[in-house]
From Swiss-Prot:
GO terms for biological process: mRNA processing; regulation of gene expression; rRNA processing; tRNA processing. InterPro entries: dsRBD_dom, RNase_III, RNase_III_dom, RNase_III_sf. Its main location: cytoplasm. SUPFAM superfamilies: dsRNA-binding domain-like (SSF54768), RNase III domain-like (SSF69065). This is Ribonuclease 3.
Amino acid sequence: MSASLNRLERKLGHTFKNQDLMLLALTHRSFASRNNERLEFLGDAILNFVAGEALFERFPQAKEGQLSRLRARLVKGETLALLARGFDLGDHLRLGSGELKSGGFRRESILADALEALIGAIYLDAGLNTVRERVLGWLAGELDSLTLVDTNKDPKTRLQEFLQSRACELPRYEVVDIQGEPHCRTFFVECRVALLNDKTYGQGASRRIAEQVAAAAALVALGVENGND
């Protein structure tokens, strides 16, 4: 193995028994047909489990919706990309020439996906206890900074943070109708989310309120919240 990959292992805190798993986790789909997408899928599931378990133990009084919102903040793409940059992960990615020229090694989504793939690779290489220890070590600072106050954000913010944690495009809001006299109007807004087949809707005395209602409905439709939190 090259000296640069040995340095990466030291930064990750894990020495791979199966070096092929590490190389596969660093291989973007633009580089080869055998790439890190399956490992990313596995790593995403493991990350959500490990983060969820840690939050469950850390916040025994939190409701389901609060835990979901805390987890969305903890595992969002921005956080993962920041960790990846701390590991200099972009220097080790195997990218196709097009992605290299366009700066793919700096792109947040590619870095976050590669880190999730490495989580999947560490799980296959060493098991759940080891990957849990590594992930919790990486996220220790973020975990320590979380409080239940972080769950009091408005629905639009919570929806945006959830979608960012999944590297999805942001929701789009559109006023579809305004009814009533100028001094007593009711705004009707639709919210479009790429992960949902159907739009969600909200109404209120202002556009802002209607958008918040539509965002709350989207969170319920996505299964992130149950509407009673």
